[in-house]
Amino acid sequence: MRRSTFKKIGKRVLQIGLPVVILALFLNQVKNNWSQLTAHTFQWNPWLLGLAFFGFMLQEVSYGLIWQNILARLGARLGLRICLRIYLASEFVRYIPGNVWHILTRILWVGKYGVSRPVAFASMTIELITKLAAGMLVFSASLLFWRDFGAIGSLLNGPLVDILGSASIFALLVILHPRVLNGLLNLVLRLLKRNPVQLAVRYSDILLVTLAWCASWLVAGCAFYVLLLALWPGAPLVALPICIGIYALAWDIGFVSFITPSGLGFREAAIVGLFALALPLPVGLATVIALLSRFVSTIAEVICVSIAYLSGGKQVRSIQQGSQTHMPGEPDLEAPGSGAVPVKLPVSVPVEGGTVGE
């Protein structure tokens, strides 16, 4: 009992203390480079800022589209409007302390349309895995453009960077095969002392969903590049694929940190570090871009989520109340649709900032 209490206290200290440390390090860096920052003349192009904002909003909409596609491949067919409203409105409760309510809300809400909990849970598991994999695939592809710029390009010659990118893509495609993926997933669950899960989907389905996520990352990465152009009109066109890869990998790094909400601090640090390796920017610009991208993407998310929440707010509140007495984690529930095998649900689900069921 005491060990569990210490564990919770330690986790809370990390969740609060680590962002404070990151913020302190950032402020110290700004202080040390303040003269160089003020010497640089930043150009704010409002039209490009607006275009970048629109791109981040498109990415938010793509989430619901991809989730609808995943549900359809699991045998649960819902209308696009319903999927968008459920996905985006359930994200609203992600800002409630605990950082798990959006998972529970989506599972319970979609159940009102006849989708069983195992299928809902499986769809979210596939969504998470393919989204992370797509981010790494996009970054691996962007490595093919790193040889012309930055520290990596000066340390490694062109063929080595190309080989690294190609090998990473091949390895990810192998890992996404259902046999390999299920084996690795259950290995991790056993190490965490959780129940196993069987994802009964075809390899072609996983690849198509991953491809859809790659398209989503392309949209977000283009918005990120336009954001860079808004402040630095001299950004070369070859920086476009580099920006797409950096933004995708930075999101992955922020997600798997599991400490701060939405990878706060980790994503920004990753963007600054990757820019230092891949693309020489004016002093301080990488930090400004990292913070500005967080701000613009968050505003885009809040607007999309608020619209969806207002269109189904009563349902969200009633489901949130019901989720306090209905937790995912019931084993051996049958998953209907397209011959899917029984799905065992693990006790916890990885989410940004923690896990469900801890």
Regions found by a protein language model. Name each.
Residues 3-4, 106, 110, 117-119, ...:
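Membrane-helix boundary/interface segments in integral membrane proteins
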Residues 101-113, 259-277:
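Re-entrant/interfacial helical elements at transmembrane boundaries that shape
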Residues 1-88, 144-255, 278-358:
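Predominantly cytoplasmic-facing regulatory/coupling regions of multi-pass membrane proteins
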Residues 92-97, 111, 121-140, 253, ...:
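Membrane-embedded alpha-helical segments of transport systems
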Residues 80-85, 99, 104, 113-128, ...:
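Membrane-interface alpha-helices at helix entry/exit sites of multi-pass transporters
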Residues 89-96, 248-268:
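Transmembrane alpha-helix interface/packing and boundary motifs in multi-pass membrane proteins
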